Amino acid sequence: ITPEMTTTEIDAIVHRNLLEIGPVAGMNNHEGSLITESKVKIGKVIEICQKQGIFFLDSRTTAATAAPQAALELGAQIWERDVFLDNTQNRADILEQLQRGVEVANRKGYAIMIGHVWSGGNLAQIMEELYPVLKAQGYSFSTVGGLYENFGG
């Protein structure tokens, strides 16, 4: 989806993609800052998710996201990421973000943390190291689809 697309084009491409990919639990905007800043355009995506019975996750790639307002006006529930883990590849920064995620989880029962585990950076290694530690402390890991089923689906 690109910013110059009309809502009719957005509707067509999202439906075509859903048919091509097959059953999905939900979708998110990965690099969709410009789309999420448009309440009309992101509203079309959220409306499709609502009608399909799938979740929408706002990755919050921009502070100017209109997704929450669009969802509110549609009466739709969306998910929003709480923490972006690897905005930098610096190990200390990633660990700090992970700690922020733990604090969010302690506060609200879960935290949606996103990152790039496949990108060759430090995140995959850090997660591999800390997974058993966090599990031993009582934390569990889930997909967003799993959260949707347990907390909001």
Q: Positions of the model-derived regions?
A:
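Catalytic beta/alpha-barrel core
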Residues: 6, 28-38, 50-64
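C-terminal transmembrane helix-loop-helix hairpin of multi-pass membrane proteins
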Residues: 101-104, 108, 115-119, 123, ...
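C-terminal domain-boundary segment and adjacent tail
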Residues: 52-62, 119-153
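Conserved, mostly hydrophobic/aromatic
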Residues: 27, 112
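Alpha-helical scaffold elements lining the catalytic groove of polysaccharide deacetylases
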Residues: 1-19, 36-41, 68-105
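His/Asp/Glu-enriched short active-site or ligand-binding loop at hydrolase and phosphoryl-transfer sites
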Residues: 47-94, 139-145
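Sec-exported extracytoplasmic/periplasmic mature domains
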Residues: 18-26, 47-54, 72, 103-106, ...
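Extracytoplasmic/secreted cell-surface and envelope-processing proteins
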Residues: 35-40, 66-67, 121-127
